[in-house]
């Protein structure tokens, strides 16, 4: 799927719509600095949790038993079985996504069963992701579930829960990221796990983070943890 510059994509609230890329698929978001792609709510008066956000599933490795996991919110399988020759691809390419904004997304079905603004699930290092914003998301702004994807020039604004989150052995890079916490319903700037069920699971999470800026809301934030980590 290729989305041209200047396109607006509307997510339907009633059906809890989300844009899901299955393993082997590619999404190219071809926004530009002057003409970005916008993914937003179809509601006349938009609000967080109006739709499900962007989910990318790939063939890179995880540290879960068997190597394959099923995405929260029934968003499909991701990862790979290391015992199957040629199935795992650390350089898996799920497309090129640049100059776009995601607004009013994220769905909380139940605790630990939620959709993020952007979910990179078993995504490989061949995937390109830069110059994006996640705005007013119900759950995490961006979460990496294992894999080796990298991203840069990201802005996470007013996201509930955590702005950046990872688990299941993420091993990518992130640079030039600005986080502005939601003053009323945020958790942490970053939540970092190797694997909640087994802290020694391999491959271990080992991302490299550079040039992060965190902005809290200590004046209005009664419910926000206002924490960096």
List the predicted regions and their residue ranges.
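Beta-strand/loop edge motif enriched in small/polar residues
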Residues: 1-229
